[in-house]
Amino acid sequence: YEGWPEGVQEYLVEKLDESGKVYFSQSVAKNLDYSEKGLDTNEQIIHFRVKGISNSGRVSYSNYFEVRQKGEFYMPNAFTPNGDGLNDICHAEGLFIKDFSLEIWDKNGAGVFATNSFKQGWDGKINDLPAPPDVYMYRAEAVDKLGFVYKLSGTIQLIK
């Protein structure tokens, strides 16, 4: 900050959540060289600002800089509901998902599973009985926190 005759003690790059609360702060060199490594998986919209602290303790804040991250959404192509704790549930994965729907059908077009809960997946059962090993069709739709819509359709192999 050039307006302080006493000079700058330090600059901090701050990350703020959607409510404006600082959840990350890092001191940076006086040339303000800063780079972000990796995707922040907690916030889809990240607000950055620079906090300047003068040698006499005065504080000044920059304007906000907003970064909007794209959501992610995908489905597996196989699962093994055999009770071993590995890939027993067929469920969607993703980041920043707000709304969700999933429908699964057998090869005859009969519905075997449906949910609107992103955390819920298919356990490989039809009417509480183990489904036969086969290829099943699915259609999934998700909406992220920014309103972007993701649509997937394809097949899932149930392996025993």
Annotate the PLM regions.
Residues 8, 43-45, 133-135:
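Extracellular Ig-like/FN3 beta-sandwich strand-entry sites
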Residues 34-59:
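Beta-strand-rich modules
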Residues 10-42:
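Recognizes extended acidic, P/S/T-rich segments that occur
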Residues 7-11, 98:
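Solvent-exposed loop segments of extracellular immunoglobulin-like
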Residues 1-6:
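Conserved aromatic anchor
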Residues 17, 52-56, 142-144:
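Surface-exposed loop/turn motifs at beta-strand-loop junctions within extracellular Ig-like
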Residues 65-160:
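Short loop/turn motifs at secondary-structure boundaries
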